[in-house]
Amino acid sequence: MEGWEIRLIDEKEILGFRIDRLAKFLDKNKDVENFNLLARQLVVMQEYYDILVKRIEKAGLLK
């Protein structure tokens, strides 16, 4: 595997972990001052995650 392929997969894994943590945080903290901004951030992070998955699939790296 080339360096960019490893970085792409690593980025997807790290982003997936962060998405999970943010989603759990928002579920438990609906009264947080920046809830709306964090909820929008979560949506964008999920969209970016989907793009990374598509790139990985196109590169034939997803099993």
Give the role of each language-model region.
Residues 1-63:
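Extended, charge-rich alpha-helical interface modules
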